[in-house]
């Protein structure tokens, strides 16, 4: 089953739109609009590309035949995959070739998936290590790029393969990383951490429910955290599960996220109508989000935006 999976990036990008659209809070001594907008865009791209790596890994691991002697596999439009079925651990090497088949970005670099010999990805608790080497993603609209290096672990908590999802109740995956290096277009490097859980179910199509699994003090549901390109700490938390449905064109149908910095907190609630009330799938029409943010002086503002 080949699926287009919308990531948390749509949520973060919407928060970025909110900050660029709103007026400066003149009662605060510092205007954080530019920094928060840039950070939201950075986080949205990182979230999208780390999710894309996990999606590509799932595509490559989708059938056990990939470890039965085929030396070269093509299931990703801008990459080739080479399988090593002899070494321990077994590996699948994904090499991105920079082809513009995705329409909005190009990718170069290598991601190596490794799994211990004898371990089957379909089994409960099976884990693969995703080693990311110079994965450079260039956005075609403005030629800006990010480069990702480091490793993450994807665990098939429940067992099962996504190609068999219609016959299964659910499949649960987690993606974690203790530190992935992100290089921004200004050559600034930062280390970000990841802690996400994705639950795949089938209800008139694929349903993906994403949550954050990291806790820091009293803050729970953290999906990503670290220091932004300006050197300031941030967290991106999922306050209410982000739900994406295939029968709604793989769009976010509900959920709430929060982006936090010491000086600013912003949140966005999804799956609303134009009045801000939760709604069912609007078909080809727009969903709306309600964005709320608190300035340094403690005042609260909100806006309803389409997505």
List the predicted regions and their residue ranges.
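C-terminal motif of bacterial Sec signal peptides marking the signal peptidase cleavage site
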Residues: 18-21
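Low-complexity, intrinsically disordered segments exposed to solvent
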Residues: 23-307
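Bacterial N-terminal signal peptides that target proteins for export
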Residues: 1-9
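Bacterial N-terminal signal peptides
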Residues: 9-16
């Amino acid at each position: 089953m080949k699926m287009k999976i919308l990531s948390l990036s749509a949520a973060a990008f919407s928060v970025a739109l909110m900050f660029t659209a709103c007026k400066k809070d003149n009662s605060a001594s510092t205007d954080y609009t530019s920094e928060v907008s840039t950070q939201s865009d950075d986080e949205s791209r990182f979230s999208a590309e780390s999710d894309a790596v996990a999606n590509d890994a799932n595509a490559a691991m989708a059938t056990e035949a990939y470890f039965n002697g085929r030396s070269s596999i093509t299931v990703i439009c801008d990459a080739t995959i080479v399988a090593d079925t002899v070494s321990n651990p077994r590996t699948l090497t994904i090499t991105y070739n920079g082809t513009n088949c995705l329409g909005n970005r190009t990718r170069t670099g290598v991601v190596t998936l490794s799994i211990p010999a004898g371990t089957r990805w379909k089994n409960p608790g099976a884990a693969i290590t995703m080693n990311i080497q110079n994965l450079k993603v260039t956005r075609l609209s403005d030629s800006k790029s990010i480069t990702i290096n480091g490793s993450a672990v994807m665990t098939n908590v429940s067992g099962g393969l996504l190609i068999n999802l219609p016959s299964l109740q659910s499949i649960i995956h987690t993606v974690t990383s203790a530190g992935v290096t992100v290089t921004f277009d200004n050559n600034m490097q930062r280390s970000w951490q990841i802690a996400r859980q994705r639950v795949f179910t089938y209800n008139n199509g694929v349903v993906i429910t994403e949550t954050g699994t990291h806790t820091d003090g009293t803050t729970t549901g953290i999906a990503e955290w670290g220091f932004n390109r300006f050197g300031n700490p941030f967290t991106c938390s999922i306050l209410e599960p982000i739900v994406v449905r295939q029968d709604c064109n793989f769009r976010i149908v509900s959920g709430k996220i929060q982006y936090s910095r010491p000086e600013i907190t912003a949140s966005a609630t999804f799956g609303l109508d134009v009045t801000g009330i939760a709604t069912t799938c609007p078909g080809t029409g727009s969903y709306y989000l309600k964005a709320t943010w608190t300035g340094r002086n403690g005042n609260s503002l909100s806006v309803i935006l389409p997505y």
